[in-house]
Amino acid sequence: MYHLNQKALLLFSGGQDSGTCLGWALSNFSHIITIGFSYGQRHSVEMQCRTNIRNKISKLSKIWEQRLGEDYIFSLDIFSQLGETAITSELEIVFDKQGLPNTFVPGRNIFFLTIAAAFAWRNSIRHLIIGTCETDFSGYPDCQDNSIKATQLALSLGLGEDITIHTPLMWLTKAQTWELALHLGGSKFVDLIRNETHSCYLNDHTTSHEWGYGCGTCPACKLRKNGWETFLMKKRAN
């Protein structure tokens, strides 16, 4: 899939998934604008990581440097007003009877995509990129393929333009996401993802591990760690 004569807008949080998607976007589109959201997230350090990732990824490739465009951040304080979650307040992370963790922020990706699409429309951009995936441990409803497709249809109808939402990680495991990073930018890009992106729900970006920074115990850290270890095993086997 290549759209090298097209612009695209990437929803960029500073995490592993959106960081990997940045490499994918720069490999597939001629101009990439990034957009981030400050919504009172507990792991606010990821917002600081965004700048470091953007600065360092442009040094990995002249082509990527030429294609990387502007960055925008929007404030969405409304989520904390809608109710507490373990992402927007200091709650202990627990799971309900259906296995859904209280890190789920209801409607978050729908909000994000709606704002991104409105911004894209004003800038004549018809391609959005988001790092959602169904294989993520969480089972967040708004990360699932049918939810993204429904949102794409609603936005296209509501804006009167065909909007395409790209989800390059939708069917990938975390190990496969590490593999994609290696394929896109080699070991230097893997190192950038490992050292500069942030996943930890508890906002720990000081404790270092082989797979990156984090507390090592929250669900996001465990998922990242397990994916890294599986990735290394497959890499060594080959």
Swiss-Prot record:
SUPFAM superfamilies: Adenine nucleotide alpha hydrolases-like
Binding site for ATP: F12, S13, G14, G15, Q16, D17, S18, G19, T20, C21, L22
GO annotation, biological process: queuosine biosynthetic process
Catalytic activity, reaction form: 7-carboxy-7-deazaguanine + NH4(+) + ATP = 7-cyano-7-deazaguanine + ADP + phosphate + H2O + H(+)
Binding site for Zn(2+): C200, C215, C218, C221
Catalytic activity, EC: 6.3.4.20
Broad EC category: ligase
Pathway involvement of the protein, from the record: Purine metabolism; 7-cyano-7-deazaguanine biosynthesis
Molecular function per GO: ATP binding; ligase activity, forming carbon-nitrogen bonds; zinc ion binding
Segments forming a coiled coil: none
NCBIfam families on file: 7-cyano-7-deazaguanine synthase QueC
Protein's name in the database: 7-cyano-7-deazaguanine synthase
Gene this protein is translated from: queC
